[in-house]
Amino acid sequence: MNTSNRLLNERLKELLEKIYPDLPAEDLAHSVLEIFWPGDINPRKRARTPSNRLWSERDGLLITYGDTLLDGQHKPLDLLQDFLARYIDGFLNGVHILPFFPFSSDDGFAVTDYSAVNPQLGEWSDIARIADRFHLMSDLVLNHVSSQGNWFNEYRQGNAPYDQFFYEGNPDDDLSDVVRPRTTPLLQKVETRYGDRHVWCSFSHDQIDLNFDNPEVLLEMLRIIRMHIDNGVRILRLDAVAFIWKKPGTTCIHLSETHAIVQLLRLLCDYTFETVVLLTETNVPRAENLSYFGNRKEAHAVYNFPLPPLILHAMQSGTARYLHDWQASMPPAQLGCAYLNFTASHDGIGMRPVEGLLPPEERDRMIATALDAGALVSMRALPNGTEAPYELNCSLFDVMRRSFKSVDDHHF
């Protein structure tokens, strides 16, 4: 690539100095540029000017797994492409295909190989064909990888560069303030060529957290992003991005280095000729979620996480008071930024986003009503040793068959 873009180089070095103050920013910046614009590919001469031309009220996304449609004869991605062309084209212009890589658990979010499409679904050419017709969203699962993948196997064997790819903790460290999305132990002891190690597992013990202290991890993620873009992905969902940087003795969520990494990704995307939108998946209270706009320097879009639980509460309780109060208090998105409104997702309905919006007794009544309708609730560990509801795991239509007062006789 042509590395003569002074503004891009200078801004990139500024961010890398924030993330890796003890490493040579000039060398790192050169590596970043060579990875993101390899060979004869070059960035734009100027960054894309912030505007709202990237989306409008007419944009809509279908969320689906790659194998939602099966017939025993065709590849699932072939079936999905046919379904989209027949029934969705003209009504929705985007599709979010949940992780389509080989995986070991968590419905795709424990990736074993980032470079391949799950052969049970199809191949990269199938992804590219869907992207030719729709705005395609993919998941960048960047906080963790599968314990059964090649990267972690190489780590356990002590083979470079993977021997430095995973975040190791010490049971004696002060981890009391770490914000958790799960109740499982944070550290997992594993056997390696050099003895036992304790690796960090923010989610499950099959999902081992990557070590972004090592710039090679960031560079590898940039290679993966480039591969997504080259195959037609135009919306990058940054899965669990809030947890990627760790510092014992802190909350280990939303740290300044995390925000600097999101800013770096935004910078690179704004210099691509392809129109790439960054969407952060931050299932947290409102102010924390909005921080990922970063004054127009971070995400192009954030999920409007309070919307699903507040809609559910309004339907169950018969009052839109809390939904209305929240809507009235929401700041408009800044120029070049947007809220992604949604009613439910593969993750369920988050409870953290209504902290400070629903009184605890209203939240608890909503949860109890959902449980009566057959929902499940996943919990998260709190620093004081107790647990709190994290997500309602349910179908939106099923959970709405009960209200605070009775069963809905007209439910279908």
Q: Locations of the language-model features?
A:
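Active-site and adjacent substrate-binding regions of carbohydrate-active enzymes
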Residues: 2-412
